Amino acid sequence: MAKAPIRARKRVRKQVSDGVAHIHASFNNTIVTITDRQGNALGWATAGGSGFRGSRKSTPFAAQVAAERCADAVKEYGIKNLEVMVKGPGPGRESTIRALNAAGFRITNITDVTPIPHNGCRPPKKRRV
């Protein structure tokens, strides 16, 4: 008996008008994730995954490229407005927001959600170079 051909079902992308861009800017890398209002990830990109390795990974330009790639990944969802949440002290904080703005998103709100300890763990010792 011949098997019936299996048809690939086309996934329907849900349309989302508002999204949240989570930017994690560390000293070594920048991670950009765009989610819907409920927190479901729609797309993400990193500076390291965008082809930058080593010390070039921690540059504002690498963060800008990561933001552009993340914006391209979520274009099919129809997002128009973005709320931006920035975490971390890294060099990619500003350039990521500028790249998302240039990609055609309307940025409605920018929030800094960097975790600040209330005198928690002891920090590492100072570097001697």
Curated annotation (Swiss-Prot):
One Pfam family of this chain: Ribosomal_S11
InterPro entries assigned: Ribosomal_uS11, Ribosomal_uS11_bac-type, Ribosomal_uS11_CS, Ribosomal_uS11_sf
Alphabetized GO MF terms: small ribosomal subunit rRNA binding; structural constituent of ribosome
GO cellular component: cytoplasm; cytosol; cytosolic small ribosomal subunit
Chain positions found as N-methylalanine: A2
GO biological process: cytoplasmic translation; translation
PROSITE patterns per record: RIBOSOMAL_S11
Keywords: Methylation, Ribonucleoprotein, Ribosomal protein, RNA-binding, rRNA-binding
Assembly and binders: Part of the 30S ribosomal subunit. Interacts with proteins uS7 and bS18. Cross-links to IF-3. In stalled ribosomes contacts ribosome rescue factor SmrB.
NCBIfam families linked to this entry: PRK05309.1, uS11_bact
Assigned protein family: Belongs to the universal ribosomal protein uS11 family.
Other known facts: Has been predicted to contact the N-terminal domain of IF-3 based on footprint studies; exactly how IF-3 interacts with the 30S subunit is controversial.
Functional summary from the UniProt entry: Located on the platform of the 30S subunit, it bridges several disparate RNA helices of the 16S rRNA. Forms part of the Shine-Dalgarno cleft in the 70S ribosome.
Protein name: Small ribosomal subunit protein uS11
Organism phylogeny: Bacteria, Pseudomonadati, Pseudomonadota, Gammaproteobacteria, Enterobacterales
